[in-house]
């Protein structure tokens, strides 16, 4: 009896010791696994302030793609965690958000809200060495892998956007007269000089360049100058909406027959529709399909199933940013490489003929810091939609 009790007790002790030993072995490993588990997307997102119309869409786009990936089991068994902070579209707040998020999480990829933030945080990204960043900026300056090795643009840079429009113009009307109208801001001035040179190369004639003060309301003097130059095409840049409708309405009243064009931040459907009847036929460059496009795009169908109401082009941009972030992470993990900034960027640059599920209408290859692809769309005010006016144009 005693012998039996002792052996039972010994067995229990041994089992306990074995369990404790196993726990000692597995516990640190599970902690390690836990530590390596999440792929973290940080975000400086302008949910309030002047850029909130875009920030809300960007945030939802990132969230939705993260949900799709996590619902499918994550990436190589790891869950994706998205940690955004509102910045109000202020650089100092954005920098503070970056510091807070990166101090509390092991961030792998980061979405920034502006050109100002991208430039300010760049030395910190280089020092950190473990983060790949993209964001809401398409600034030409950022399209420089030497100067900005840990960043990329989710689409063409502003100069490439002009390049796509100019290529379309040269095909539609060889030798056309073109006007550039832009805001007196870093955003506005960005593509102007290079694009004038590009226009010449394409045999186009830039007949006038008009710079307006940011937020200027009275453009009557500038419209007279524009009318005298009599362009076939007028490209606006450095604005969201105002003063574009004022230019178009007054120009038409004065007998101008120019076609009117814009770049990405003017081209959301909801923005263009605010131009009213005079905005009919307004054209511009868009690197993504619109929410309501009818051409085959499996990822767009998925988005429409998740969100039956219209989603902005900013939403699609955020969604594609998350897709490229996580594709880069997946390629690092597939190659058994640590997710450093350099490895994530090299993985991004290995993307060749990549299908975004139709969100960009052609397969994409990312050689440097941008994706120089886009399509010209045109406003159909009767249908209240943007419709394709060109094929997909690659530079």
Question: Language-model features: where?
Answer:
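C-terminal segment of N-terminal export signals and the immediately downstream linker at the start
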Residues: 6, 27-45
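Beta-alpha junction/loop-to-helix N-cap segments that form part of ligand/metal-binding clefts
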Residues: 40, 53-60, 72-142, 154, ...
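Hydrophobic alpha-helical segments within soluble ligand-binding/sensing domains
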Residues: 94, 153-176, 217-220, 243-244, ...
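Segments of small-molecule ligand-sensing domains
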Residues: 305-315, 326-386
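N-terminal secretory signal peptides
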Residues: 1-8, 15-27
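Extracytoplasmic "Venus flytrap"
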Residues: 42-62, 85-91, 114, 181-189, ...
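Extracytoplasmic ligand/sensor domains, especially the bilobed periplasmic-binding protein
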Residues: 106-209, 259-283
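Extracellular/periplasmic periplasmic-binding protein-like sensory domains
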Residues: 248-319, 389-393
């Amino acid at each position: 009896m005693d012998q039996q009790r002792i052996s039972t007790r010994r067995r229990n002790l041994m089992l306990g010791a074995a369990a404790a030993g196993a726990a000692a072995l597995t516990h640190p490993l599970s902690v390690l696994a836990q530590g390596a588990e999440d792929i973290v997307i940080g975000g400086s997102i302008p949910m309030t302030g002047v850029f909130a119309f875009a920030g809300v869409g960007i945030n939802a786009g990132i969230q939705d793609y993260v949900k799709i990936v996590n619902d499918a089991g994550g990436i190589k068994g790891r869950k994706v965690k998205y940690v955004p902070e509102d910045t109000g579209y202020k650089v100092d707040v954005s920098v503070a958000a970056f510091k807070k998020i990166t101090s509390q999480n092991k961030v792998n990829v980061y979405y920034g809200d502006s050109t100002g933030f991208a430039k300010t945080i760049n030395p910190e990204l280089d020092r950190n060495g473990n983060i790949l960043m993209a964001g809401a900026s398409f600034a030409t300056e950022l399209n420089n892998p030497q100067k900005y090795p840990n960043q990329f643009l989710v689409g063409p840079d502003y100069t490439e956007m002009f390049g796509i429009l100019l290529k379309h113009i040269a095909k539609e009307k060889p030798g056309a007269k073109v006007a550039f109208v832009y805001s007196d801001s870093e955003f506005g001035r960005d593509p102007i000089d290079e694009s004038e040179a590009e226009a010449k190369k394409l045999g186009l004639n830039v007949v006038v360049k008009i710079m307006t003060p940011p937020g200027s309301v009275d453009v009557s003097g500038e419209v007279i100058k524009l009318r005298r130059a009599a362009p076939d095409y007028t490209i606006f840049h450095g604005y969201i909406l105002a003063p574009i409708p004022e230019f178009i309405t007054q120009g038409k009243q004065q007998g101008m027959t120019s076609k009117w064009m814009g770049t990405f931040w003017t081209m959301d459907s909801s923005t263009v529709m605010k131009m009213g009847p005079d905005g009919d036929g307004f054209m511009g460059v868009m690197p993504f399909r619109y929410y309501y496009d009818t051409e085959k795009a499996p990822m767009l169908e998925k988005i429409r199933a998740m969100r039956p109401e219209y989603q902005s082009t900013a939403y699609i941009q955020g969604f594609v940013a998350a897709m490229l972030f996580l594709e880069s992470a997946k390629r690092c993990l597939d190659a058994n490489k640590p997710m450093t900034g350099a490895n994530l960027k090299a993985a991004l640059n290995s993307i060749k003929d990549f299908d975004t599920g139709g969100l960009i209408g052609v397969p994409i290859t990312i050689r440097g810091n941008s994706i120089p692809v886009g399509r010209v769309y045109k406003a159909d005010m009767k249908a209240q939609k943007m419709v394709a006016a060109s094929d997909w144009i690659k530079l």
